[in-house]
Amino acid sequence: QRVQSDPLFASMSARQQVDVVQNLIMGTARPLTDAAQTSGALYSPRKQGAGLVDALAATTSSVYPTVVGAPEPSRPKADLGDGTTGWHFDVTLHNLGAAPATYELSSQALSEIVDGGFFTGSATDWRGKGVTVTYSGAAAGSGEGASVTVPASGEVTVGVDIAPGSEFASYVADNAPNGTFLDGFVRFDSKTDGEPDLAVPYLGFYGDWGKAPIFDALASTGGAHTFASGIVNGVTGDSLGYNPLIKVGERTGEPKADRYVISR
């Protein structure tokens, strides 16, 4: 209703008006802090998306974000892919209003906590403790607390660099050798009365996405992490590779791969 009636959007085509609704809803959503922790770490974007929708903010903001080069420009999020050397993405802030708007930049670089060999569902914020986040472009400053001002009826672009360091690399090697997600939010905290805060989620995978095996280790070789893969009798459910004359409850050791017998 706002987009259809507000003069700020009058010059947009019907398609652009549909897209800007999504931009405003996602861009003004509020990232939520993980209630199970006291560290202040946010829930991962993989768990909360762009955050909690703030209807008041979405219907009053004159500024909305887009991610440069995003497959869907109406969805302000940065999909970074996999790798270990870091990522760069650009966020453009579009100001439809008649007054400039100023924001202070902050961010979190989240990676899921591993405990006892298992992912816990909660994350650690590695920013400043193994992952460096810096800003460029229109940002006045490169670190946390940098500011950016969007001129009236104008737009500016801020560059964001996510750089994993050796401390984070060591943690991943020790706890998630097949790689792990590194994601989070870049937040634009409003310093202009009447303009809501903005946020853009990003998602990267530290490592090689294709490295992790689809199946756990074979029962015949040992070393399974959670549940060993094996071949079973389709009728009885018994594992192949054991002497069938020995009762299931009395079998010991691992199945012998050279004893698999399959026939039609």
What do these predicted regions represent?
Residues 55-101, 107-109, 172, 214-242, ...:
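Beta-sheet-dominated interaction scaffolds and their linkers
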Residues 49, 87-95, 184-189:
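Buried hydrophobic-core signal for structured, non-transmembrane domains
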Residues 165-212:
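Terminal connector regions
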Residues 37, 115-119, 212-216:
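Outer-membrane beta-barrel and related beta-rich outer-membrane complex signature
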Residues 89-95, 160, 262-264:
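Aromatic/hydrophobic beta-strand junction motif of beta-rich domains
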Residues 1-38:
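Hydrolase catalytic cores
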Residues 23-70:
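Secreted, periplasmic, or luminal enzymes acting at the cell surface/secretory milieu
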Residues 65-76, 98-172:
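Surface-exposed binding patches on compact interaction domains or structured appendages
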